[in-house]
Amino acid sequence: TVSSMVNGGRRVTPHLGVSVLDKKGKTVKTFKYGEKEGIVSEKTSETTQELLEKVVSEGSGKNAYLEGYSIGGKTATSQTLPRSAGKYISSFIGFAPADDPQILGMVIIHDPQGIYYGGTIAAPVLRDIYDNVLPYLGIEKK
């Protein structure tokens, strides 16, 4: 999985929440998710983080750039069948902060109208999501 490739090589069960709070902010329930064995070495994971950060800072994922944050990611554009229909799927998967991933998200746009490249149309959507989510998670700008 992509998350395993950027978090030190550890496989983590995907999850949507870590705790439930009452009206006063007191933790009512905490969810625990186990980590499984490594699927790649820490060195491979570190190299992957660095390369995917460059996709956003220097490459096709520039539209995912968010000032003050380091984001890593990968763009993708694929043509659907039949090819003669001229339809595409545009996507971007990204994680932040790039050097210590805390969140991973993916945007998939089926049959975009006009421009259809993942880095052009999907990457900015994840940037806008992270613009709201990262401060909410307490991840500060550098």
Enumerate the language-model features and the residues they cover.
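Active-site beta-strand/loop architecture of penicillin-binding DD-peptidases
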Residues: V2-K36, K43, L52-K141
